[in-house]
Amino acid sequence: MTQDTLRFAANLSMLYTELPFMQRFAAAAKDGFKGVEFLFPYAFEAQEIAAQLKQHGLQQVLFNTPAGGADTAGMNAAWDAGMRGTASVVGCENEFQAGVLRALAYAQVLDCPRIHVMAGLLPEGVSADDARPAAQATYIANLHWAAAQAAKVGIDVVIEPINQRDVPRFFLNRQDHAHAIVQAVGAANLKVQMDLYHCQVVEGDVAMKLRQYLPTGRVGHIQVAGVPQRHEPDVGELNYPYLFSAIQEAGYGGWIGCEYRPARGAVTGGTSDGLGWLRRMATGDWA
């Protein structure tokens, strides 16, 4: 198996973290990546990032809407404050809309074709069963609005099931739930971001999930990491050569984001040293 039909993007929030953010673009390009993704760009001017993309021949393939906040300061502080999106959070509709509009403005400058809208957390002190109906209604209404705004500028919106081991109380956890939401909203530019790490942690049966959902055309982005420690794809319990073959066989033509923590950590060369799996794919040695 080779990577001829698979396109891998470096996640610059998790890879090359020994370097300042703006130096990670050059490092990714040097290692052969053609695409990049990251969590949030909002601490930097969009034009600064666009210049790095152009200089190093990289395509921006994905980033997140803000984790919260209604202004620049709030958006930049939201993640560290424990926020994980506002799409399903009752009463945060104005905050949600401000974040989506900010993300779309950045996406247009970066020529990025999709943005990830994080679902958010279920409220504390309320049982999940009691909180879910209102969260679901809020989520669907917000995604209707976000997809309509994004469609005006030719951008896709993706939603990602995330496991509750890593993010307790996260609203969206399962692939079937995400696809049901996409169908309920009914917008052509709303799709699922399928993170195989989260899928394995929550429900397993990853290859069958790929074969079930990729042919629908509703998977807009894939991400990979080893399980259980979220290191390189060749570290852990998942058989990624088999899964990459399944992705190829399903005819998936989108990007695969490398959203993992290098096993060597944030040390000089740590990311590059861990890319043996990608180099082996390029030469067909990882069968």
Regions found by a protein language model. Name each.
Residues H56-G74, Y106-A119:
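Short coil-to-beta-strand
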Residues E37-H56, N64, A119-P123, S127, ...:
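Glycine-rich, proline-tolerant flexible connector loops at the mouths of alpha/beta enzymes
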Residues G32-G35, V89:
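Short, basic, glycine/proline-bearing loop/turn elements
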Residues E37, V61-N64, H116, V158, ...:
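Conserved beta-strand positions in the central sheet of alpha/beta enzyme cores
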Residues D80-K191, V201, D285:
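Active-site acidic/histidine proton-transfer and metal-coordination neighborhood
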Residues T2-S13, N64-T86, A119-S127:
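N-terminal small/glycine-rich loop or linker at the start of catalytic domains
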Residues M1-G32, Y42, K54-G57, R102, ...:
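Histidine-acidic metal/acid-base catalytic patches
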Residues R24, F38-P41, R84-G85, C92:
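Alpha/beta catalytic barrel-like cores
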